[in-house]
Amino acid sequence: SDHAVKGSYDWFANWDFSQFLRTEEKDGRREFVMFDAEGPGAVVRIWITVANYNDNGILRFYLDDSDIPAIEGEVLSLISGHFLADAPISTSVSPLTPYKQRGHDLYLPIPYETPGITAAGNRPPGENFFYSVNYRTYDKGSIVKTFTLDDLKKEADVLDGTQRELMEQPILEGKYQKKVSGDKAITNLS
């Protein structure tokens, strides 16, 4: 609701889309800043989902105060389209859901001294962009080798082995399971 009250069940109900830190002008285009933090550190997970997406969104990773992005490409291609890595490090769920309606995840560590990630492009009216960036900040003075695509290519065998090992792990069942039949839904997990 547009008039949600703190403490009500719908406080800020699903109104968290397209909320960016700021908008910047760069090379004649508007860029929407999603993430900015003190370094050194590493982005360890990015989650994105979209609504009314027109396939024109560009994601740019500016690292170490560079004006040239270390990574640049169409949003879903970068996050879950295997541009940087394969499954399960770059993935989207659920496969039963249409691609643009899925949650898209990238678990590839992107180390930096000073980061900045922008979602750029012309956002048409009605386009909704939901995201979460998880990161780690290291102690001042920690030595971090900033991410480069060249280093990613050099370490392709390590990345392939990691992806393969993760995919070969068995799916563990929970200790407690409850089968719900019919039109019932679990509304309490205690």
Where are these regions (language model features)?
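Beta-strand-centric surfaces of beta-sandwich/beta-rich domains
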Residues: 1-190
